[in-house]
Amino acid sequence: MEFTQKVLRSEKPIHELALEYEINYAGKSRADIRSEMGRRINVMRDAALKGTEQEIRTRSGLVVGNGKKLYSSLSENSLTGPIVGKGIAYAVAIAEVNAGMGVIVATPTAGSCGVVPGALISLEENLQSKNLTESFFTASGIGLIIAENATFAAAVAGCGAEIGSSAAMASASIVEYCGGSKKQALDAAAISMKSYLGLACDPVAGLVEVPCIKRNAIAVANSFASAEMALSGVESAIPFLEVVGAMHRLGKKLPSSLRETSRGGLAVTKTALKIRSRILD
């Protein structure tokens, strides 16, 4: 919990503490670490572009180019507005690229890979106020707190550990991008993660496609809503670190059927079983 304590005690912003951690961990210079983050951001941008320009399809037939469909339908009259709407489209696009065996960056997992980049890339394109590098270090710092105190593995703690973590990472990084304080970033992370406590991991046919991809989109909307609340001064009644602990404890209490085994939840509905039979039998 060394990094967690630094975040709680230091006056430095989360992105700076995360960068310092990576410098010490990797034994590389500040310039090298920032350059590597830039390279990974470019991988995420490429995935977003691919998934919105190409109709990504998978052999299962469950992925049918929804990223391109969403992006193409965006307009000034979109219900979610330009920032959230484009973020949702990017999240779906990136998650579809992952399902189609394309190159992505796990943020923090492959199954939740669309949330952080979807939200941040859209934010940058719409506001154009600053570079994204620091924002992704903020996201990684929130991720490190979760890693030190809980898990990202849905097989251990359900989908709250995956999509809940990614939403927390995204919401905190949105807050810092918009000039919010560290406390506001942590409040946003707490607010967003609370929405996913006890969420089942129940992938249809054992594939990271349904409901995983659409959960990425919903998590983007969640992250912006949580960031908006925190930036306005709304506080989380429960501190982020305690929310992380609750996510971990509750997730581990889920039956194994709801922890990535595809033996419960959506995975055993009548339609899901027909899909599984068609794909696997």
Identify the meaning behind each predicted range:
Residues 1-102, 233, 240-281:
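Generic N-terminal targeting/processing segments that precede catalytic cores or assembly contacts
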Residues 78, 107-110, 154-162, 210-214, ...:
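Alpha-helix capping and helix-loop boundary segments enriched in small/acidic/polar residues
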Residues 101-119, 161-166:
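Conserved phosphate/anionic-ligand binding catalytic regions in large, soluble enzymes, centered on
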Residues 176-281:
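Functionally critical mobile loop/hinge segments
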